[in-house]
Amino acid sequence: MKPLNTTIVLAAVVSLAALVPLRGNAQDAYSAYLLPSAAASAPCDNTDFLKDQQKFESGQLTQDVLENVCGTVTYVYPKKHTTSGWHGYFLLQLSAGNVIEIVSDLGQMNAPAWPWVQIGDSATVRGRYYYDNDSSQGIDWTHHGTSSSWTTPGYVVVNGTKYQ
């Protein structure tokens, strides 16, 4: 009976190992395999984002770019009314010392009432990275809508729930 139990445990370990990619971080594995709503979503690429951020800071990049980032929510602001409607803002920590503001157009999002994100939540975000200066930068267009100036829809996945 013991060899059978060992075989079952070994088979389970091998099966689980097949689900985890050999490269990438735990968030990538989580997003890729455990989030059905995010399965069709682009994987997060914090490294690419940080490279783009450095390019903006040095003047090598001047136009907004599409980014896919993931991390932990560290702060949630109250909703704010702007000239383009109600927006929700939160800070997403990508890695130690790297935090970016996420902007969501609440009128465009298919989401519950704000705040639908809380401190400590895991989030994956796809949207437009804008950089005006060191203190004015963030990721917006995190919703399904597009315009003539930005043609790529975005989204936010919070703890496995996708909002567009």
Where are these regions (language model features)?
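Bacterial N-terminal signal peptides
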Residues: L10-A18
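OB-fold and OB-like single-stranded nucleic-acid-recognition modules
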Residues: A26-Q164
